[in-house]
């Protein structure tokens, strides 16, 4: 029986093999510890501040800036808050 090497997952950031001792997982992809950083600001990430979009890693702030809602009325602060009490949901 011929020797068949085990396939190791490739890091989406650098394309090299990722071994179990150095892997970080986000969005179902395995990254190297050194590649596990925001693709916009290069901030080191962990499981609490990491977001993945199409194999790219982002911190939550940069992800919101790049893919969040844009235009007039978004990010307006406390003036945009609603005082809806949900009365329309209590139909009896």
From Swiss-Prot:
GO biological-process terms attached to the record: cell differentiation; muscle organ development; muscle tissue development
Motif Nuclear localization signal mapped to chain: 65-70
Primary residence: cytoplasm
Known tissue expression: In the embryo, expression is restricted to the somatic, visceral, and pharyngeal muscles. Within the somatic musculature, MLP60 is distributed throughout the muscle fibers. There is no expression in cardiac mesoderm or in fat body.
GO molecular function: metal ion binding
Domain LIM zinc-binding: 11-62
Top-rank taxon, per record: Eukaryota
Subcellular location: Cytoplasm; Nucleus
One Pfam family linked to the record: LIM
Record's keyword terms, sorted: Cytoplasm, Developmental protein, Differentiation, LIM domain, Metal-binding, Myogenesis, Nucleus, Repeat, Zinc
Entry keyword annotation includes Zinc: yes
PANTHER family named among the record's database cross-references: MUSCLE LIM PROTEIN MLP84B, RHO-GTPASE-ACTIVATING PROTEIN LRG1
Protein's UniProt name: Muscle LIM protein 1
Originating species: Drosophila melanogaster (Fruit fly)
């Amino acid at each position: 029986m011929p020797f068949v090497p085990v396939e190791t997952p490739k890091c989406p950031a650098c394309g090299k093999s990722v071994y179990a001792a150095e892997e970080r997982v986000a969005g179902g992809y395995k990254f190297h510890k050194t590649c596990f950083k925001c693709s916009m600001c290069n901030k080191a990430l962990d499981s609490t501040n990491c977001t993945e979009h199409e194999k790219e890693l982002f911190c939550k702030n940069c992800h919101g800036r790049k893919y969040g809602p844009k235009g007039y009325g978004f990010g307006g602060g406390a003036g945009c808050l609603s005082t809806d009490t949900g009365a329309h949901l209590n139909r009896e």
